Swiss-Prot record:
Phylogenetic classification of the source organism: Eukaryota, Metazoa, Chordata, Craniata, Vertebrata
Impact reported for residue 155 to A/K/N/V: No receptor activity in response to MTMT binding, even in the presence of copper
Effect of substituting residue 169 to S: No receptor activity in response to MTMT binding, even in the presence of copper. Little to no expression detected on plasma membrane
Record note on what altering residue 307 to V does: Decreased receptor activity in response to MTMT binding, even in the presence of copper
Gene this protein is translated from: Or4e2
Organism, scientific name: Mus musculus
Effect listed in the UniProt record for changing residue 118 to A: Decreased receptor activity in response to MTMT binding, even in the presence of copper. Complete loss of receptor activity in the absence of copper
Name of protein: Olfactory receptor 4E2
Family affiliation: Belongs to the G-protein coupled receptor 1 family.
Impact upon substituting residue 155 to R: No receptor activity in response to MTMT binding, even in the presence of copper. Little to no expression detected on plasma membrane
Topology of this chain in the membrane: Multi-pass membrane protein
Record field: transmembrane: 25-45, 58-78, 98-118, 144-164, 205-225, 237-257, 269-289
Disulphide bridges: 97-179
Amino acid sequence: MGALNQTRVTEFIFLGLTDNWVLEILFFVPFTVTYMLTLLGNFLIVVTIVFTPRLHNPMYFFLSNLSFIDICHSSVTVPKMLEGLLLERKTISFDNCIAQLFFLHLFACSEIFLLTIMAYDRYVAICIPLHYSNVMNMKVCVQLVFALWLGGTIHSLVQTFLTIRLPYCGPNIIDSYFCDVPPVIKLACTDTYLTGILIVSNSGTISLVCFLALVTSYTVILFSLRKQSAEGRRKALSTCSAHFMVVALFFGPCIFLYTRPDSSFSIDKVVSVFYTVVTPLLNPLIYTLRNEEVKTAMKHLRQRRICS
């Protein structure tokens, strides 16, 4: 409580992506277009799955949740980044900074757990197909989604508590375009070595353990595909390769950012742009371009809309 009472900083100032005004204007248009396409693409996937009965199965149930999380995840940081590209003084209040930090880790951690669950779903479907309907029924799927949100919330609460328990009495300049734990705790008026270790341990353990679980699942799947027919192998590889591309695009930046006690914020900003702006857009593109069922369902919905 004493640490909280010492807090005197009321707002933070972002340095942003660059200090070059011309580059900021040039960045604004493509980032705005990317964000709008992210919202549209992921929203279309959710709507398509909800209104297509034959897609009401575990794989697409999880995919719709992934699209929802991507919408939320990008919306936590991108609007503030776009605002900062147009303003000379990029500020955020202390309370809003902590809120942004909380929701950033909530959605990021929930996505990590969801991608791990999706890998397990594919493992059951391909390796033990006769038990799939019993193991992955809708009741279990709903329970898994509840568990991943609970896990994401607990992780985010831990990260947020470790951040706000520190005293902030200046400076208040964040070398980033959004509030995240590493750049924020650097501004604390006390030694943050132990806090940094705890934060890296929390995020790093989750990222690495889930990534190892994913790699293990796909390794077992690849070995089991030798027993499948040519058509079965083709369909399974198409689904799994799309999912693994999403995993690599998301886990790579997360492991890079959150498993190092010391960060280079100039490099971190580039990596952060990739996983907060680019990856949420690539997810719907990867799944729709490589998934005939989703593409066909979207065409049917469009035809129904035209006919009505």
